[in-house]
């Protein structure tokens, strides 16, 4: 696990405020719900060697790719059950189904990085297709950075996860 200090995060935020990170226009423009500033911040924070990044609610993968881009030793774990999409008319997928467009777009975004020296080490990215509540977190390695991007969420759900 990498060591992230308060000073590191402050410097990462200052860089992100100025639009500075390792991200290219490609990563900045991937469709997703995160802002360019947030992607830059996550990319900068995850630049510490051997960082472990968890994203709950990976959606289409743009923020997770920002964590991985240019950070060769960063381990990225993304969790999503692909059952809720606030951009769909029926936000919740019918029982027994997922929003397959979300999952296929996430897979397509990852597939863009399968060839050549492209800034992303796909072997360091793991996608868990599950509700985060169903994962036995005691069996997971610890994470240095957690991006909890789940909608809808309530305070007790958030508190239960982090306690």
Give the predicted meaning of each segment.
Residues 1-33:
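Rossmann-like AdoMet
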């Amino acid at each position: 696990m990498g060591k992230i200090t308060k000073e590191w995060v402050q410097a990462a935020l200052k860089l992100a405020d100025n639009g500075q990170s390792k991200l290219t226009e490609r990563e900045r423009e991937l469709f997703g719900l995160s802002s360019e500033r947030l992607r830059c911040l996550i990319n900068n924070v995850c630049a510490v060697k051997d960082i472990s990044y968890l994203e709950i609610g990976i959606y289409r993968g743009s923020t997770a790719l920002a964590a991985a881009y240019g950070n060769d030793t960063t381990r990225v774990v993304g969790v999503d059950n692909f059952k809720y999409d606030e951009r769909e008319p029926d936000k919740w997928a019918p029982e027994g189904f997922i929003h397959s467009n979300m999952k296929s777009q996430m897979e397509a975004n990852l597939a863009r990085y399968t060839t050549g020296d492209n800034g992303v080490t796909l072997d360091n990215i793991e996608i868990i297709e599950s509700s985060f509540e169903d994962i036995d977190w005691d069996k997971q390695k610890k994470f240095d950075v957690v991006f909890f991007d789940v909608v809808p969420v309530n305070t007790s759900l958030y508190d239960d996860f982090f306690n």
